[in-house]
Amino acid sequence: MSSPIIKSLSVKAANIPLRKTIISKIRSFDNWAIITTEITCSDGTIGKGYIGPYLADYIPAIASTMKQLFKQFVGRQIAPYQFYNEVMKSTSLMGRSGIAIYALAALDIAFWDASAKIAKQPLCVHLGGSITPVKAYNSCGLWLNPVDTLYDETLELIENGNFNTLKIRLGREKLSDDIKAIENVKKALGNENLLLCDFNQGLSLPDAIHFLNALDNQGLYWFEEPIDYYNYDGYKELRQRMKTPIILGENFHGPDDAFRAMDQKICDFIMPDLMRISGISGWMQTASIASAYRIKMSSHLFPEVSSQLMRVTPTADLCEWTDWAEPLLKEPYAIQDGHIIIPDVPGTGIDFNEDVLEKYKINL
């Protein structure tokens, strides 16, 4: 029996309202711009996925690139890794970052979903893993909000899924306010549980040295992106000075960036973003690199697919949980005792609420 062949692509986009406003050093958001992908095969299988490129104004350009890249795969049997390598080779004249990588990721996720559905296996099983709850941290709050609100917000985040690991955003104008924010969160969370922190690239190197020195004894699990992600020399200096682990990776554009960061020893941990790392195929390559360097690997956003991939990541650490896409999903993944529960269904289990897509539609 021959394998199904690829027939068509459907790309839609929406600007989904967030339940809580994101307030970080880099910028604030009230909505999350999402692109959905559906790839239909000759047997009726539909591979699905989504990416979130943040800036709605750029979505038409990404969608156009997706459609252009997709043309070469019509009429062929599903072969995600082969397709991925072909696109990566073809983008050598465009550069392996930005819009081209986002478009590739969107297609790659849907190709893998279709491949797993054709095999009648959950994605993680299709990739050689097993279905097991995935340790996660709640990243749905603790932005740069007034410090006196953080105690109550922490209790809310713990209760919503029985989490014992949270992430706080730091980098306020006054260091004393960051210290007070940590104190308020820890008062609710407890010192025995993990608290992570993220500066969202908001500090200059001199300010980062000052802030991180002052916070190095706070018992934080990691310092995330204190300075511009591309300042490798700065990260080397911070890593040498601090005992708290340094993590970055959400801005790695493809496995090559991840390799350079680990090879140059600029961080202790990494946390790839499914979209920017170039999709499932890019994640799997990055996971192999992290395994070779013995570096713990966490995730950034996209908890549905990322949790499945954590099951086949040798150095898997923590999966970031956000609820940003939940209004769009027919059946959001469940959380139990701070773990993401992977559904026992073929593929990723992602299906879209068409009413929500239509309500918040972005014209392409």
Model-derived features with residue positions:
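Conserved, mostly hydrophobic/aromatic
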Residues: 6, 44, 107, 120, ...
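Short catalytic helix/loop segments, enriched in acidic residues and glycine
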Residues: 28-36
